[in-house]
Every structure is written in C-alpha cells, then in structure tokens.
From Swiss-Prot:
Protein name: DNA polymerase beta
Enzyme class: transferase
This protein's UniProt keywords: DNA replication, DNA-binding, DNA-directed DNA polymerase, Nucleotidyltransferase, Repeat, Transferase, Viral DNA replication
Function of the molecule: DNA-directed DNA polymerase involved in viral DNA replication.
Organism, as annotated: African swine fever virus (isolate Tick/Malawi/Lil 20-1/1983)
Recorded superkingdom: Viruses
InterPro entries the UniProt entry points to: DNA-dir_DNA_pol_B, DNA-dir_DNA_pol_B_CS, DNA-dir_DNA_pol_B_exonuc, DNA-dir_DNA_pol_B_multi_dom, DNA/RNA_pol_sf, DNA_pol_B_thumb, DNA_pol_palm_dom_sf, DNA_pol_type-B
Keyword match Glycoprotein: no
A Pfam family matched in the record: DNA_pol_B
Family: Belongs to the DNA polymerase type-B family.
One of the protein's GO biological processes: DNA replication
Region listing for 4 X 4 AA tandem repeats of A-G-[NK]-[PA], in residue ranges: 1071-1086
Other comment: Consistent with its intracellular location, ASFV encodes its own replicative DNA polymerase and three base excision repair enzymes: a class II AP endonuclease, the repair polymerase Pol X, and an ATP-dependent DNA ligase.
Extent of the Sequence repeats: 1071-1074, 1075-1078, 1079-1082, 1083-1086
Amino acid sequence: MDRSEIVARENPVITQRVTNLLRTNAPLLFMPIDIHEVRYGAYMLFMYGSLENGYKAEVRIENIPVFFDVQIESDNTNQLFLKSLLTAENITYERLESITQRPVMGYREKEKEFAPYIRIFFKSLYERRKAITYLNNMGYNTAADDTTCYYRMVSRELKLPLTSWIQLQNYSYEPRGLVHRFSVTPDDLVSYQDDGLTDHSIVMAYDIETYSPVKGTVPDPNQANDVVFMICMHIFWIHSTEPLASTCITMVPCKKSSEWTTIVCSSEKNLLLSFAEQFSRWVPDICTGFNDSRYDWPFIVEKSMQHGILEEIFNKMSLFWNQKLDTILKCYYVKEKRVKISAEKSIISSFLHTPGCLPMDVRNMCMQIYPKAEKTSLKAFLENCGLDSKVDLPYHLMWKYYETRDSEKMADVAYYCIIDAQRCQDLLVRHNVIPDRREVGILSYTSLYDCIYYAGGHKVCNMLIAYAIHDEYGRIACSTIARGKREHGKYPGAFVIDPIKGLEQDKPTTGLDFASLYPSLIMAYNFSPEKFVASRDEANNLMAKGESLHYVSFHFNNRLVEGWFVRHNNVPDKMGLYPKVLIDLLNKRTILKQELKKLGEKKECIHESHPGFKELQFRHAMVDAKQKALKIFMNTFYGEAGNNLSPFFLLPLAGGVTSSGQYNLKLVYNFVINKGYGIKYGDTDSLYITCPDSLYTEVTEAYLNSQKTIKHYEQLCHEKVLLSMKAMSTLCAEVNEYLRQDNGTSYLRMAYEEVLFPVCFTGKKKYYGIAHVNTPNFNTKELFIRGIDIIKQGQTKLTKTIGMRIMEESMKLRRPEDHRPPLIEIVKTVLKDAVVNMKQWNFEDFIQTDAWRPDKDNKAVQIFMSRMHARREQLKKHGAAASQFAEPEPGERFSYVIVEKQVQFDIQGHRTDTSRKGDKMEYVSEAKAKNLPIDILFYINNYVLGLCARFINENEEFQPPDNVSNKDEYAQRRAKSYLQKFVQSIHPKDKSVIKQGIVHRQCYKYVHQEIKKKIGIFADLYKEFFNNTTNPIESFIQSTQFMIQYSDEEQKVNHSVKKMVEQHATASNRAGNPAGNPAGNPAGNALMRAIFTQLITEEKKIVQALYSKGDEIHDLLTYIINNINYKIATFQTKQMLTFELSSTHVELLLKLNKTWLILTGIHVAKKHLQALLDSYNNEPPSKTFIQQAIKEECSSIKPSCYDFIS
C-alpha cells in the first residue's frame, strides 16, 4: 500500500473532509517537517510535511522579499550613494527603501532612539550575499543579514514558526502522484495554534543487515565482497508505536510472515533499488534508524555508488526530481555533520538528506538525553527506559544463516531486523523527542532540522532576533554577524567561602540558593546591549537627568573594564530586550507548570484503560514539552550572552553578570552572619547555613533530662530538623526582602529546598548528607550527594560501593554518649574489609568506561588503543577474527578492566609496571573470555584511595604549613599517602612485591660484579686481537672460542643467583599466594631472564665491535667471507669455476671460515638462548647445547658448508 491508501484506511473521516476542502480551495492545515531553499535565481522556499489527515504535502512559497538593512551613520550616506557603491561592484539590486530602527548596541535617549537604515532588496540570495560581504568590508553595520539560511529570517519576519501548524489560504493546488503540491505567497500563510490537533506526519524507521566473508570484522562498504543483504522498514504515525505498514527486503529467501511484506531480490543492486521504490511509495516525513548516520546511510550510499545507481535511487526518494550525481553528492549527501551531544562532546553524522524527508538518528537523540551514559547501544538505551529489549541474535549466527540460505533461519534474521527498526520508534515516542524539538523550533523560529542538528546557542540567538525586530519589543535592528575583536579570558570568578570540612552530627545545615541566578540578575539590573552606556561622561549626564544606572567594573586580561546599564525601575517601557524576553519566557513557563501539575493529578486518578487516558497522556506530554523548551532557553540564555562569537556579545554585560552575582552573594553572606547564623560553605549561587545554637536549647535540654536512649536521640534530631526548616523559611523571606530593597526589584530571590543532617563537607562542591525536604527522613540509603567521585562518569562499581559504605556508615545517628568513630576510623574499617576480604568482589565490580578521543592526550587510552591496533593487525595476518579488538568511534565510550600483569623489574630491581595503565587495560569481553586475573591492588591504589583520602583530608596531621598555597591539594596528597601505607601493611601481595624488589637488587649487585670480571677478561683478549698484527686470525679464533667456554664458567654465577631466587620463592610461599596471582614463582623466572639478558647484551657489544674496529680486518673478513659464500653457491649448483688461490690464501680462508662458523654460532646460540629464556627456563644453556646449535644452524643455512670445507 502507498501512503495515500494507508491514510485513507486509517483516517477515513478526516480524509473525506480534507478532500472536500481541496475541491473548494478552502483553507487547509499543514504541519511542516522539512525545509529546502532555492538559492539561485528567484528565491523560493519549499516546506514539506503533512496535511491534517496525513497526506504528503509540498508548499512552495513564492514572492518572498529578499533584503537586508544598512545603518546610516553619516549625512553623506544616502540612497544615491549606496546605489553608486553597489553599481560600481556590479551588484544587481531591485530597489532601496529608507526605514528607522533601534540599533542593538548602546543606549540611545528617547529623542535619538531610532536611527536611519536603508533596506536593500534583491532578486536572488547570491546578489544579496555579495552586497553584505562588500558593505561589511567597507565598515558598514548591517542588520537582517543572515548569510547561511535565509528561511530563518523569513520565519522571524513573518512570525511564522516552521515546526507548528500553518493554515494555507488562497493557494494554488496541483496533485502530483502521492504528493499534494501547493503554491502560496507569504500573505497566504497564517500561524495556527491548537494543541488538540493530532499530527499525522509519518515516520519511517529502518534497519539494515550486512555481511562480510571475513569473519570477525565489521562489514565495510568499500570492500566489494561485503554486502547489505536485508533492509527492514516500518512506518508509523509520528506519535504512535503501532506500525501502519512493514516491509522486509532481502537477498535471501526467507519464510514469509503475516506481520510484514517480504520482497526477495536477486542482487544487492536490486535490493537497494527496491528500498528506494518502497521509500517513494511511503514518502515519509521523517526517516530514522539507530546509528544510521554512522553506518547505515554511509553503507547504502557507498554501495549505490559502486553499482552506479545513486542518482536513480536519490531521484526515486526525493521530491526534487532529476538531480545529477555531482549535485546529489555536493548538496544532499551530508558527509560530516557535527552534532552537539553535550558541552564537551560532539559526534559526526553522515546521511542522505532527500528533500521532503528529515533524517534523524535515534542514537544521537538518546545520547543528548543521556549525555553521561556509560553504554550507548540500542539495548542499553532500551533498558534505561524500561522498554522491551531487542532480539538477541549474534552476528556469527546471522552470517551463518545467510551463507546457508536457510529460509527458516532467515526468518529469524528478518524478525531481528524488524524489531530493531521498531525499537527506534519506541525510543522516539517514549522520550517525546519530536514534540520537544518542535516546541524549541516554535520558540526560536527555526526548523526541525535546526533543532536536531544545531546547538542551543544558535537557537537562542535566532529567538532574540525574532523578539527584537517586532514593534512590541522596540524594532531593534539585529545582525547575525559577529563583529569586533574577539578576546579570550576569564570573567570575574564566583564568590567562594571555603567549606568547613568534616562530619557535622550536632546540628542541621541548610542550603540557600538563588533561583536561576544569571537570568534573575539580567532581569533585575536590566542587562541588555541596547541599555549599555560606555562612557562616564554620558553616564553622569543621564544620572543628572534622573536616570538610574547600574555600574559594573571588573578586571579582564589585566585591564579594568567598566560600564553602566540604564535600570528599568520596574517600568515596562524601560526594560531592555534581554529582560523582556526572559520575563516573557518565565511567565509562560509558570502557566505551563501550573497546567502540567493539574494534568499530572488527573493522570494519577485515571486508569490506563480509561477511554480518555491516551488523550490526557498526549496533552500532558505536549505541555511538558513546551515547559521544557522554555527551561532550555532560559538556562542557555546567559551562555549565549557570554559567548564571544555571538553577534549579541558585549564584554561589560558578560562580566557584569558574574560580578553582580559575586556582589549579591557577599551581600547575603554578610546579612546572614549579622543575624547570628553560621556559614559552612558558599559558592557562586548558594550558601550552606547553620542556625544559632540557641535555637535548639529547649529541645537539647529536654533530651539531656530524658533517659538518653537512642529513641530519645532520634526524637531530638527530628525536632532539630523541624526547627531548622521553620527558621530557614523565615530567614529566606527576610533575605528576599533585603535583596528587594537593595536592587529595587523582586526578580532576584533565594529559596531553600532541603535541610541536610547529618552532613559532611569534603571540599569545594563536594559534600553529602541526609536530605530532609518536607518532613524529617533519616534514611541512609537515600543520600544527598554532590561532587563526590562515586557519581563521576566512568567510575567502577568497586569505587562506588566502597564510597557508599563509608558515607552510609558515617550518616548513622549516634548519641554523643556513644562512641562516635571519627571519619578516618570509618574509612580504615571499610577499606580494610575491602582489601582483606577480596572474595566479596565480582568481575562486574571492576568494569569501568572511558571515551576514545584520538585528539586528546589520554596516555593510558592511547597506549591501550595502540595495543589493540597491533593485535588486530597480527590477527588479520593470520586470517583470524579481530572484531573483539575493534576501535570504538571517536567520542564513543568503551568498557574495560585492569588486569594483573606479571610484576616486572628492571635490571637494577626497580618495578617497571606501575605507571603503565594502558598496558594493563583489556576489553571486558576479552578479559572474561580468557578469565584474566583482575589487578585489584591497582584499583585500590589508583581509584579507591583517592576517594577515601577525600573523606579524611581535614585531619590535623595532613594539614600543610602556612606558606603552601593550595592547601586542599596538599592535604589530599598527604591523606592518600597515609592510606597507601595502610594498605601496604594489610595486603599480602604488596608485601610480596616489596620482597621481590629487594631480591632483585641483591642479585643484580652480585651478578654485576661477576660480569665486570668476565668483561675485563674479554677486553684483554680482544685488545690482544686488535694489537696482534702478526697473527690476527689465530688470536680472533682463540678469543671467540673463549666466549663459548665462558658459558661453562657462568654456572658459578647462576648457582648463586638461583640460590637467592629459591630462598625468595620459599619465603613467598610461606607468606601465602596472593589472590589473583598465578601459582609458581614467575617473579623468580623474570629475574633469571633479566640477568641472562644482561649477560647477552654485554657479549653482543663485544661481538659487534669486530665489525666496527679496524678497516683492514673488516675488509679482509668481508672479502674472504664473500668468497666463501661464492664458492658454496657454485658448489651447490655443481658449476665449479676456476679460482686461483695461493696456499697461504687457502689456509687463511679455511681458518676464517672456521671463525665465521663460530661467529655465526654465537649469534645462533644467542637466539636459542633468548627463546629458552622467554619460556622461563631457569637453567642456562650448556656448551654442548651451543655447539649443537652451531652445527644445526650452519647446516640449515648452508647445507653444503661442511662438505665444501672438507
């Protein structure tokens, strides 16, 4: 069935009504989804979406004025002058028009409020852009000068949101296939608000399955033998998870299902063409998949290119027909679109943007919703939402079914693929993704594409311009081009009161916070660029005329920045653009939150089976989406105001907001202190306050006069919390009145949400406690935690568990009469249990995550990825599977564990493995498959101890001298060192490792002495060899033979070393084999290997010296050995050639050949020796072994060598 047939089947009543309206050319409702512009020639705007019943529609808007504005700042600049400038540059324009507007930058008094501008009209965007560039380069200020997407300006000027219902009037109508085409002018479009309307836009969710003959690899579209063999597709109403139609396109026949239509294709080319054909029958408004912008779309496009059908496929799918291949690749195949996930993270997307259908990657949407998610797979996101999971079908089985062509099994593959596509829509609906982004688009006058693919600041900027240009906000002329010098520096820091660290168990602490501090400051002090006064003379002049000004000053890049903002004094007409917009957003959100609360209460009273439940649920989701959109804009407002790349950026405003925040927090601080309250901590927009002791006198005395049981103490704590709540409510009202008197408005307010008791502060922005919100609640399992490392992304379960145990134990109510263990005692008790009783930990407790960012200098991750790359290359050489070592996508998080490596020491006895985390990292799947031992001690030392030190670093013994600047860092370092010594004292493995190092150093000292003796003998012999000019060859032979005999004399050294190692092994066995260590004595083997390697290295240096000392000897050896090689070669081919040699030469040749054999044998022996050592053989090679090795090697390299010599 095609789209029109499906719509008629599903919505017969609405379809009949829409059909009647089309016949009579009556007004129609249209929901835009996708926007495209014709930028060359006469400008036209195309909007694609659906009519009220779900019909696909194209709305072409013609006769849109194309213009921008130029500010006239000189009497010499007029229309004639501008015309001459444009004509001189061959810029074609239509006409010029004089207008007046308010400039956005700088305060202007009432009589000079408006400035003259000239509006220049054009026929095309090309000429307009040329003119903007030219006049900006000439120094003119321009406005309404969008140079990227003109449709945003159209939306702002017409007050026509691009993501909500629009009523089409006076249209020209032309049905064409499945698409209903309309032509209108801007006057024929009217914004239509009706939240009760149901949107019947269509979403297509799809998934592809691919195959590679190279097992264990991810199929690559650039490989000819890697194919896409199946594509499964559903279509849905945009708000529903029930499929309207489903199709499975496959290259392999599979058992048919009643739940979907199966199309069997004979080749990959036909499969791709069938996909495009089905797409064209459904003409969806939105196309979505999971990770399709990173895999599915690039695979489809690349394979279509290889088959030479991309142009055909695009023109089937697109509503812009007859596009050529180069145009498709240049304009519609988006290869690298950077999508903002969070402030720190972006992701690259690739997709084919066919006009009429908006591409949307569900994975990107979910990552934006869960920016700190450890796992970003489809299965993980489904689990987070409590939705049904995907089907479990391993790739190796899927590929096996594909190879065997088993239709029964291929039906399982089809079901797997169909369900994956279904789950994409499930996630979109569960998270209300499209309605949320639509509401953002409505507020910001941007398209749905903008709301998906652009960051929040871009939309805030567009929203500000939309407010500014209309009469009710003063017709402010705004540019979209950032101007002026862009300075980078820090604005005034927040006012911070260092925390009083430690555990507070005697009286409650309450957090007092400014509500939306920065937006509140903007509203209170009228921070807005058109209210800014730059000069002191102008400020004095305005104050003399009775204006009230707010002065700001701060240091920025070693200079004083100052300025004044004209205050509004609560007079609406005096409010600046920023405060007006924020107040409007705030009022709208307040109304929506009230409505949301009522709808929520109704939802709780109605069962899901009630006929009206779905409608109520839909209404609740829509209202929630609206208030969320408002919240997003309010929260990102200051970010755009402080962004030095924004056209609205004003340094005195950005710094003035933060410095005013400082001022007000100090103001409240002094007020609270003077009231007799105490301050535990303060930072940026909040203070943590304790009430005066006198508040609790009566309840404390009642407790002291009681039997002092634990029940009485709990009652005391309960009453203290209630008294604190009451006192803070009163204090909060007093603070707000004090602020109102100071700044003259009620926009700047403080509120308290919870009382913390007990509470512990461990550092700046680091604290935890039991939160009491409406009533006292002493549940230690529901702690209020801020900044403690257990909530940090990537942490292991081990760290979280130990941290939670410490915090829960410290939060227990204990009477003063009982033993109240200090925090350091609690930490040591929990830590000891964690270290000594290691059997309590499971493999999952050690899994942690990290992000792969190739451009970031994360040494451990870089080392790990380098190792994984080497493994992949090694496996590929042998034709083995390597997918288990695949590199994650840049920016993607991956899971790993730290495994135990054999403790290694260098030749001097120093450990070499402590600083190489990257060498110990292993993927979780690999560590599980090979049952690799976890390096628990690494986790304890590198993760757990830092967390534990944070709890105790306030102890007196860890405090720094007065001359230390960073006292917290010093105390933290000392506390961690203290805990490291504590762990060494209780961990058996750590003791064993220390002993190993001592034995290594003893052995090294002994062996080093012996080596020096032997090297001395070698040196004398080779010295004689080089000085013996009469018979150098004989001396060389004797010296080299001595090297072979040296191996016999090594036994003395080895015997002594072996004895030390055996003693160490005995001592280690008595200490017990530590958990996670393999049995035996690998440390001893490593020691032997290290010593042997040292001996070999020293010998090799001497042998290599033969080739570098003495040109004569070198040349002689080379000449004769070459002749030997030549003779052997000729002998092997039985083609002996005449070669005249004197008897002296023959004798010399034979002696040198013997020498060469011995020399070769030494290298061979070393090779065999190294192989032997690598297998942990404790016994050194004997003389017999070396001689046998020489014979074997020589006979293998030169089979006829001995025959020739004889």
